[in-house]
Amino acid sequence: MKTSITTKTTKLALIIAALTVSSTVTAKTLVYCSEGSPENFNPQLYTSGTSVDASAVPVYNRLVDFKVGTTDLQPSLAESWDVSEDGKVYTFHLRKGVKFQSNKYFKPSRDFNADDVIFSFMRQKDPKHPYHNVSNGNYSNFESLEFGKLITSIDKVDDNTVRFTLTHPEAPFIADLGWYFASILSAEYADSMLKAGTPERVDMDPIGTGPFRLAQYQKDSRILFTAFPEYWQGKAKIDKLVFSITPDASVRLAKLEKNECQVMPFPNPADLPRMKENADINLMQKAGLNTGFLAFNTQKAPTDNVKVRQALAMAINKPAIIDAVFRGTGTAAKNLLPPGVWSADDSLKDYEYAPEKAKALLTEAGFANGLTIDLWAMPVQRPYNPNAKRMAEMIQADWAKIGVTAKVVTFEWGEYLKRVKSGEHQAALMGWTTATGDPDNFFGPLFTCRSADGGSNSAKWCYQPFDKLILEARTSSDHEKRVALYKEAQQMMHDQMPAVMIAHSTIFEPVRKEVSGYEVDPFGKHIFYQVDVK
């Protein structure tokens, strides 16, 4: 009898071992060669594409989300919603049975509900909220939309219903809720970490309802995500998602060619022909809803002078930059809105390249003998700027022709963003990819007074006539009126020149042939839930 039991036990152990080995062998892993390290894992606080790709996209959901690869909004954590006749009350009916992830610090005891929605927004809205100041508490997207003023209350009707009351109708409100700062965090996890005395863990060890959970992060090296088996839309096709942090585009390509990673962002334009010739690579592309620009700090001399800003704009040989830096992957920009965004004013006339006129303007501004300026260049490739260092050097050479001495400055990406937000720069290469497709998502975060203090307004431009236009457009339900107001805003920006609009680019993404289901995101994010790999 003992022998029989032992034999059965041994056979069972062998079967379990075989199954374990089999599952290990068949586990599907996709490696994404990302361009940089996230600042942290809370998209309410850190909004760069690099941070959002590592937080909002894999870990979290929102009440509404965009259909992958499109600009079409669809229900997500909210199954449906009702809007009052006066346009000021939104009632969201929440999806039932949605599970939160867990980690070594926390195991959820309940499903997603209205408390999580209220926590996620009130943390950003209420200065007295216990989490408001955690992790430095800078909610630039929330504040740039003036959501603190717009939302008068968020009420729990019941566990599966939440009501937002607004001070006035807001045309892009639903679209804004699909923006990544509106990701839904776990209130229960937050309460647990607050009691443990480690509230910042919520932002560094995230727990969401999304398709992947964060398993490991080695700064500047690697991020490991594992598929969340209880994801409400069904488990992802891949088991592991690895971000191999690789700042150099040439190194990213070398890894892709050796199948050390299967997807890479922001290729060097010069490498595109090589990728097209490689039978193992599928070079995907889509028109990007983005704009690369040079922001002038309008609160610092000498760029606080509009004539100086206009002169510096006229001195930039934009066509030469498009040819040398973008190499066929970009078109010259003359206003903030790219052609794919409604109300973009194609009739607006760009500043001509005119060094002599620029010199005359500098003289009028009191700088007949020229001036010295710092010119900041971002250290990473972005969808709207494949080579900021090269672009800065070309602008530096252009400005030298009108007597302007520019010193090119750069920092590590997180430090660069931090310093630009605090206004240390005079002129900085920046850019934007819309998160919603609405014109307000360009004007509001980037150039309104509200976003000038610690927000995404890198020009630190606060111009009341412009602010009034944007507010009027945002609160109007008349589409044609909004179009007219946004066109007026584009002309006003052209005249005041808080930033030189340089380029709109096409997004190119090389993907290994082993990968299926990948879609280029028009908003510039990298989404892997729907992806499979052989």
Task: Describe each region flagged by the PLM.
Residues K28-S34, S51-A54, A171, Q218-S221, ...:
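Detector for C-terminal structural segments
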Residues C33-E85, M122, H129, I207-T209:
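N-terminal lobe/hinge region of extracytoplasmic solute-binding protein
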Residues S37-D53, L77, K104-P108, F173-S183, ...:
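A structural "hinge/loop" feature
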Residues K67-V68, K149, D159-N160, P169-A236, ...:
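Gly/Pro-rich hinge or "lid" segments in bacterial periplasmic/extracellular proteins
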Residues E79-P130, R163, K255, P302:
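Aromatic- and charge-enriched surface segment that lines or borders ligand/interaction sites
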Residues H93, K125-D126, P130-A190:
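Surface-exposed binding/hinge segments that line
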Residues E200-D203, F228-R274, A392:
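Ligand-site clamp/hinge motif
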Residues F212, T303, A332-A365, R382-R390:
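Structural transition elements
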